[in-house]
From Swiss-Prot:
Motif Cell attachment site, chain ranges: 476-478, 529-531
Residues bearing carbohydrate: N212, N514, N535, N799, N887
Source lineage: Eukaryota, Metazoa, Chordata, Craniata, Vertebrata
UniProt keyword Membrane, yes or no: no
UniProt subcellular location: Secreted, Extracellular space, Extracellular matrix
Gene name in the database record: COL6A1
Protein name, as recorded: Collagen alpha-1(VI) chain
Amino acid composition bias (Low complexity), ranges on this chain: 427-436
SUPFAM superfamilies for the chain: vWA-like
Ranges of Basic and acidic residues composition bias in the record: 299-332, 370-380
Role summary: Collagen VI acts as a cell-binding protein.
GO molecular function, one term: extracellular matrix structural constituent conferring tensile strength
Gene Ontology CC terms, in alphabetical order: basement membrane; collagen trimer; extracellular space
Length: 1019
């Protein structure tokens, strides 16, 4: 029995050792694995799902590509004795993101992942690739391994939508940059055909991650292309991972495992664990020791005012006061004489086209997605590689000592928080490598109040602060009481000698003497010199002396003295005598020129559009696509905005109105229009248009047009209305028998045919029927475009608004002219090379306008005004295109048939030629007038020669008018042509006989032809 028990114990011991060794081997193998985290991002939007028939075929190819890729995810052995292991997951997206499967280890999760991919049902709506990439990044970071350089995204998409589409998650550039910032490599795989390489290049990490990867193809070599794409991507990942996993020196292959070793010694003490959860509140402690000496107390309150002090000593004399403030400025002077009126400026040129308008408002946000299901709890991660410690930062500069602050009040301790729940102890992982700095997060909510901290140690005393600024000067104290009389002082120093006293009065006479007169005594010795007398007081200033004679002039001083102070304004002088009358000014603008100026400067005189009722019929079928549907709505709003701003159309009750009908298959029409219960202005209508949802059904255009006629056009009362139909021109006429010409009887129609999401061209026959081009009356306009983005082109919008406002109401700028006498008017047209054929055609149109105006003017008799047209070029190159004629139809036809000579310029020969014509053809009693088209440049002709010829023309009774075009004008020759004088140019005469325009297009601009014809008729 004992032997049996010993044998059983030995078996148990060997079994435990064998199990322990297997566990150790498994741990060794797991530690040597080199994991790769791979996530598929699959596009199942409408641009992929509905591109080819049968619908969903490209999605099926994408699923097949993904499953074939998953089958290739097998372990790879590296020479550094490590194995490449795969973790794979997938999502698919359209305008929302659906997680197919989170990261799953291969090969154990291969079958489940493939089944999930095969079960995909495409969404078939908008394409939000930016949101899908960011969701894939999140799944890689949350569910992947701890390594940073082993994460890959496989983005399978066609690159749609087009540029300019507003993506809700920051845009494709932002998503691609975020992946690069986090070290995630992104492969972009195309869904062909019609993919957008530009967008795919943005998605890829660099060109090596894009190349020519494709997941679908309509070519016979599809399987080979897909297989090559999968193999190339896997080889790139394998090479990248081998470099990162085998960065150390390679070792030879490991041998078979040896026998178990002896039990090791007791291990070293482990690292301190993480701080545990906050424990329960402890028992109250014993009373603490006496605390340290308290801080200095707070500053006391201000004391009461002291008693009044005694009178102080008399203060010393104060310092001299500061300079006073400058005095107030003097009164404003009298107004000067009014200036003379300035000369009238010439009308300016037309301004350049303004910059494009501001970008429109962003569209409305889509509905918020539903809350996702909670994910499964992840397995604990493997122990990471310890990160290298960061470099020690450089010591900062010592800051300046702050001012000594006053001690604050001691705060009251906060309440103890409730005991927290004790959490389970997690495994302590080594610190990872420092990650890149993430984007700045939003401001978080304030955290709960922390526990009351213990009293810190007394800080070191601060450095002594700098002396404060001197305080303000104190107020003068009150006078103290009178003091007691002081003791008698010591005698003072002797004072200064006083002034001499007054002369005393004469004394009384003494008694008479009784002695004899003695002899004169000898002269005494001269006495000593007396002390100097005291200086007398200063005398008063004496009277001013007479003015002395002027001295000789001094030497010149080359240095100028300082400028004196500006003197005060002098008194107004007397009014001067009126000056002599000035010369006669040039004549003011006539009536036609005033109208021209008003038309250019006054916006109220511009042509106005409206009232006009506008009807939009919007195709919302499946073949349009969600993105194109959004663009079509933007187009409607932009047309309304342009009509409001550029054409000043007022969309309000009683004025212009707008309505929009969107449609798909039968009975799916939706109407929004001004006059609805919840739409009372144009802003509400535009918001209602933005809120229209894509129907994505069939296409019954005829039924929609009939619905618009019965439900919308009956609301419109204006005779001026336009319908704009936006469709791909592919109506299902088998199911919809309603004719496409339903609107032809009631309104002009513009049919806009745009290629669908499959790039199929619109049906031109249906578009022509919608636009009523086969009808005898009310024919509209049919326009075709390749894609919907062209609808938002500036020039295209301009063409649409111009058609809507083709019947503008313009002010009447008629400027009637009257001939008081018969007149024979000749138009002498320059046909030389310097004019150019295009400008010559412009001149012909201008000549026809002049001829029509001359012949339709008020005149004494029907045949009293005749017009002739002659063109000229070089010498002996003159041609009468129209002899004197009063029939405008004949003149217009002849002018249209005029051929450009394209030769030299000789205006002298032309003037001599027309003198002969007038002598042969002019009537007696009729005024002779000629309008010469010339810039004054004539080959080989001097101003003196022109002067002689013009004087001969004037002597023949012919009045000359000149029309100069352009800026390269020979001014002296032009003045001679007008006046016949090379000197003493008469400005007033020139104003009536000389016309100038900056270029040939200005001939047909405004009412210039009326100005020219009026001046010729009046003179």
């Amino acid at each position: 029995m004992g032997l049996h028990d010993s044998f059983l114990a030995l078996l148990l011991l060997l079994g435990g050792a064998w199990a322990q060794q297997a566990e150790i081997n498994a741990r060794v193998l797991r530690a040597q694995d080199c994991p790769v985290d791979l996530f598929f991002v699959l596009d199942t939007s409408e641009s992929v799902a509905l591109r080819v028939k049968p619908f969903g075929d490209l999605v099926a190819q994408v699923k097949d590509f993904t499953n074939r890729f998953i089958d290739k995810l097998t372990e790879r052995y590296f020479r550094c004795d490590r194995f490449l292991a795969w973790n794979a997951g997938a999502l698919h997206y359209s305008d929302s993101v659906v997680i197919i499967k989170d990261l799953t280890a291969m090969p154990s999760g291969r079958a489940e992942l493939k089944n999930s991919v095969s079960a995909i049902n495409y969404i078939g709506k908008g394409t939000h690739t930016d949101c899908a990439i960011k969701q894939g990044i999140e799944r890689l970071l949350l569910g992947g391994s701890h390594l940073k350089e082993n994460k890959y995204l496989i983005v399978v998409t066609d690159g749609h939508p087009l540029e300019g589409y507003k993506e809700p998650c920051g845009g494709l550039d932002d998503a691609a940059n975020e992946a690069k910032h986090l070290g995630i490599k992104v492969f972009s795989v195309a869904i062909s055909p019609h993919h957008l390489d530009q967008r795919l290049n943005i998605i890829a990490t660099d060109h090596a991650y894009r190349r020519n990867f494709t997941a679908t193809s309509l070519k016979p070599t599809r399987d080979l292309d897909v297989e090559e794409t999968i193999n190339n991507i896997i080889e790139m990942i394998k090479d990248n991972m081998e470099q990162s996993c085998c960065s150390f020196e390679c070792h030879p292959p490991r041998g078979p495992p040896g026998p178990p070793g002896d039990p090791g010694h007791e291990g070293e003490r482990g690292k301190p664990g993480l701080p545990g959860q906050k424990g329960d509140a402890g028992d109250p402690g014993r009373p603490g020791d006496m605390g340290p000496v308290g801080y200095q107390g707070m500053k006391g309150d201000k004391g009461s005012r002291g008693e009044k002090g005694s009178r102080g000593a008399k203060g010393a004399k104060g310092e001299k006061g500061k300079r006073g403030i400058d005095g107030i400025d003097g009164m404003k002077g009298e107004a000067g004489y009014p200036g003379l009126p300035g000369c009238k400026g010439s009308p300016g040129f037309d301004g350049t086209q303004g910059p494009p308008g501001p970008k429109g408002d962003p569209g409305a946000y889509g509905p918020k997605g539903g809350k996702g299901e909670p994910g499964e709890d992840g397995k604990p991660g493997r122990q990471g590689i310890p990160g290298s410690p960061g470099e020690k930062g450089a010591p900062g500069n010592r800051g300046e000592p702050g001012p000594l602050g006053e001690t604050g009040d001691e705060g009251s301790p906060g309440a103890d928080g409730p005991p927290g729940e004790r959490g389970s102890n997690g495994e302590r992982g080594p610190p990872g490598s420092p990650g890149d700095r993430g984007p700045r997060g939003d401001l978080g909510e304030p955290g709960p109040p922390g526990d009351q901290g213990r009293e810190g140690p007394l800080g070191p005393p601060g450095d002594q602060g700098e002396p404060g600024p001197p305080g303000p000067k104190g107020y003068r104290g009150d006078d103290g009481p009178r003091g007691n009389e002081g003791p008698k002082g010591s005698p003072g120093a002797p004072g200064l000698p006083g002034d001499p006293g007054l002369m005393g009065e004469r004394g009384e006479d003494g008694p008479p003497g009784n002695g004899t007169i003695g002899f004169p005594g000898a002269p005494g010795q001269q006495g000593d010199r007396g002390d100097p007398g005291i200086n007398g007081t200063k005398g008063y200033v004496g009277p001013k002396g007479d003015e002395g004679e002027a001295g000789d002039p001094g030497n010149d001083n080359p240095t100028a003295g300082p400028s004196g102070i500006k003197g005060a304004k002098g008194h107004r002088g007397p009014e001067g005598r009126p000056g002599p009358p000035g010369p006669v000014g040039p004549p003011g603008p006539d009536e036609c020129e005033i109208l021209d100026i008003i038309m250019k400067m006054c916006s109220c005189c511009e042509c106005t559009c409206g009232p006009v009722d506008l009807l939009f019929v919007l195709d919302s079928s499946e073949s349009i696509g969600l993105q194109n549907f959004q663009i079509a709505k933007d187009f409607i709003i932009k047309v309304i905005d342009r009509l409001s701003k550029d054409e000043r159309v007022k969309f309000e009750p009683g004025e212009s109105r707008v309505g929009v009908v969107q449609y798909s298959h039968n009975n799916t029409q939706e109407l929004v229009a001004m006059g609805d219960a919840n739409i009372d202005n144009i802003g509400a209508l535009k918001q209602a248009v933005k809120n229209l949802k894509w129907i994505a059904g069939g296409t019954h255009t005829g039924e929609a047009l009939q619905f618009s006629k019965e439900n919308l056009l009956r609301r419109f009362t204006s005779n001026n209305n336009v319908a704009i139909v936006i469709t791909d021109g592919r109506s299902d006429t088998l199911r919809d028998r309603t004719p496409l010409t339903s609107l032809c009887e009631v309104t002009p129609v513009v049919s806009l045919g745009i290629g669908d999401i499959f790039r199929n061209n619109p049906n031109p026959d249906q578009l022509n029927d919608i636009a009523c081009l086969g009808m005898p009356r009310r024919q509209g306009l049919s326009i075709q475009r390749d894609n919907y983005a062209e609808l938002l082109d500036d020039s295209f919008l301009q063409n649409i608004t111009s058609y809507v406002c083709r019947e503008k109401k313009c002010p009447d700028y008629t400027c009637p002219i009257t001939f008081a006498n018969p007149a024979d008017i000749m138009l002498l047209v320059d046909s030389s090379t310097s004019v150019g054929s295009k400008n010559f055609d412009t001149t012909k149109n201008f000549v026809k306008r002049l001829a029509e105006r001359f012949l339709e003017a008020s005149k004494p008799a029907e045949d009293s005004v005749r017009v002739s047209v002659v063109q000229y070029s070089g010498r002996n190159q003159q041609k009468v295109e129209v002899p004197f004629q009063r029939n405008y139809t004949v003149i217009a036809k002849a002018v249209d048939n005029m051929e450009f000579m394209n030769e030299a310029t000789d205006v002298n020969a032309a003037l001599q030629y027309i003198m002969g014509l007038y002598q042969r053809s002019s009537r007696s009693g009729a005024k002779k007038k000629v309008l010469v088209f010339s810039d004054g440049n004539s080959q080989g002709i001097t101003a003196r020669a022109i002067e002689r010829t013009v004087q001969e023309v004037q002597q023949a009774g012919i009045e000359v008018y000149v029309l100069a075009v352009g800026s390269q004008v020979n001014e002296p020759n032009v003045r001679v042509l007008v006046t016949g004088k090379s000197t003493n140019y008469d400005v007033a005469y020139g104003e009536r006989h000389l016309f100038r325009v900056p270029d040939y297009t200005s001939l047909l601009r405004g009412v210039f032809y009326q100005t020219v014809s009026r001046k010729i008729a009046v003179d």
